[in-house]
């Protein structure tokens, strides 16, 4: 999977010379992510705010015929299902979204490439429910999950939190748990490092919480 997140546009509002940095009132970061999706099950994230929306049917207008998408519902502990058949999406919820911070299982019958295009979320808040949920970083970064930004993703880890990362190649999960102030598990004591475009399971044993991020642009 190749990732290219670029500053493509800067919206400038100024009175006077538009090139003066002191006169920038707002900046929009627009980027793109080239995502190679393998055959079979994988956990996928879209880390850009797409226009006109982040519906699965918009993001994947014409995937391989037979492609399936499963989105986990943390409230009901069940999956919402969509499938692309004969040029159309059908299933439980045609309004299913895959926005920054969310995640799904995708199961195409053959590998394909797609490009996500949209705005980078300069400020984000991802809800992490009690129990199992599928989440992702709202920013397209591959960094240690619980380390503080800018060196890490700033996940609000708590004692007992579990993280499961699915491998398309092996069909198994990598497991790590935060216990008594340290990570233990398959990562050998290091925090999980999700890839750009990767979603993962979190098992939060405590109350619901928010994973907040602020990304600063400029000098």
Which ranges hold each PLM region?
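Sec-dependent, cleavable N-terminal signal peptides
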Residues: 1-23
């Amino acid at each position: 999977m190749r990732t290219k997140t670029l500053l493509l546009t800067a919206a400038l509002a100024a009175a006077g010379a538009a090139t003066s940095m002191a006169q920038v009132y707002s900046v929009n970061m627009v980027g793109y992510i080239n995502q190679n999706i393998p055959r079979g099950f994988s956990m996928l994230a879209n880390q850009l705010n797409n226009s006109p929306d982040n519906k699965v049917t918009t993001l994947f207008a014409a995937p391989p015929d037979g492609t399936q998408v499963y989105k986990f519902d943390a409230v009901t502990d069940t999956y919402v299902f969509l499938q692309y058949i004969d040029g159309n999406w059908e299933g439980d919820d045609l309004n299913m979204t895959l926005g920054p911070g969310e995640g799904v299982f995708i199961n195409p019958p053959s590998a394909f490439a797609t490009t996500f295009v949209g705005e980078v979320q300069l400020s984000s808040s991802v809800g992490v429910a009690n129990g199992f949920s599928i989440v992702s970083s709202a920013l397209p970064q591959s960094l240690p999950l619980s380390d503080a930004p800018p060196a890490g993703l700033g996940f609000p880890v708590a004692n007992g939190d579990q993280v499961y990362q699915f491998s398309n190649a092996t069909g198994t999960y990598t497991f790590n748990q935060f216990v008594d102030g340290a990570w233990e598990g398959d990562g050998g004591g290091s925090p999980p490092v999700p890839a750009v475009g990767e979603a993962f399971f979190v098992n939060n044993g405590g109350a619901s919480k928010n994973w907040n991020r602020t990304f600063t642009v400029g000098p």
